[in-house]
Amino acid sequence: MTFRALLLSAALMATSTTAFADIGDSETITGTDDVKLTATHLETFNKPWAMAFLPDGKALVTEKEGTIWLLNAEGKKLGEITGGPDIIERGQGGLGDIYVPSDFDQTGEVYISYVERDAKDDSLSGAVVQSATLAISSNGGSLSNMKRVWTQSPKVQGNGHYGHRIGVSPDNFLFISSGERQKFTPAQNMNTNLGKVIRLNRDGSIPEDNPFVENGGIASQIWTLGHRNPLGLDFDSEGQLWVHEMGPKHGDELNKIVRSENYGYPMVSNGDHYSGVEIPDHETMPIFEAPAVFWVPAISPAGFSIYKGDVFADWKGDGFIGGLSSQALIRVDMDAEDGPSEAGRYEWGKRIREVESGQDGAIYVLEDEEGGRLMKLMPATE
C-alpha cells in the first residue's frame, strides 16, 4: 500500500482573515490549497463530541457530559433528547458517538456510544454501544427501547483511548472502532476487543462470515486488529471503510480497512512512545498493513467525513479530518495518483472534535471543549 509522511511547516499553514465569536458571525478561511471557505458560527455547546444528521435535515449533537441536543435544519438548538444513558465524564470518557442509519425513517433506530464504570470497581471503565428508538418532537425528543449491542472488554484502569466511533456499512453491518485503552499489547490480543475494528449485525449478533468467527468468543467480533486510538470512520462511495487513528508521539494514520488485516500497533508505528522509546516504522515489518497516509508531526485526528455532496464539486470523494493538537481541518485527496494524501489544511485556532457533511452539501465542524462552536462551511463568494 502506498503511504507517505506529510510534514507541513507553520509557514504553510492556512490563515483566517477575521476573528469572530458571536452566533451568526462569519469569517473567510484560506487553506494551504488556496481555496477560500466561509465559516459561519451556528451554535455553541459544552464539550461537544459527535454530530449526526436526520433525514429531514435536523441534526443531533452529543456533549461529553451526557446531553444530546436536537437542532433544526439551520443548526439552532430546539431542545434536549431525553432518555439517554447516565454518564460519568472522566478523562477522555463520557458520552461519545451518535449514529443515524439510512433506514431511520422506517425504524426510528439510532446508535449511541458512551463510557461506563464498573459497578464493583469505579477505577475500571470501558465503552458501550447501544441501539435506541428516537422519537422527535417540536422542542426535542426522547430515546426508548435502549438495547446494549456491544461492550468493550475487558474494562481496565485509566480514562483514555476508548475509540467508540460507529458506522453502518452499505451492506447493513454495524462497525465500531475500539481503542487499546493506552495499554498497548491488547491491540494484538485476540481475547480482547481492545485496539480493534469490530463488525456486528445490527442487533449486536456475530455475522457468520466474520474472519475469526471460528475462534469463538470475543475474537468472533473482530474485523481488523492492531489499532491504537481510532477516532474517525466513514465509508466511501464504493462501500470501502476508512478509519483514522491517533499514533503515539506522531505517526497518526489514515487506514484503508481490509478484512482480517493487522495494522501493527504496538509492534510498528511511524511515531514513537511518549517515553522516548522508539517504535519500528511500518516499512521495517511489511507483514503488517501500512497506513494509506501518516502524519509526522502529529495532527491528532478526530472526526472523519468522506464528502459526497455537490456544493464542493471538486472535493467529491475527499476525506475531511478534524485536528485536535493541530487545530486544523485537513482535506485528504482519496483518489490521488500515488494514493491518498493531504491536499489542503485550514488552520482553525481551536481543537476540532467532529466533522460531518450535511444533506445541503455544506461541511460542518464541531470544536472541542467548553464553548465549542458548530461551524458551517461553504465556498467563499468574491
Regions found by a protein language model. Give the residues of each.
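Gram-negative bacterial Sec-dependent N-terminal signal peptides
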Residues: 1-21
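Aromatic-anchored helix/helix-loop segment that forms the rim or "lid"
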Residues: 283-298
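Beta-propeller blade signature
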Residues: 126-138, 190-203, 257-258
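Conserved blade-ending motifs and adjacent loop-strand segments that build the rim/top face
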Residues: 227, 338-359
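Blade/loop signatures of beta-propeller domains
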Residues: 21-38, 138-143, 205-215, 267-286, ...
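Beta-propeller fold detector
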Residues: 40-41, 77-85, 140-151, 204-212, ...
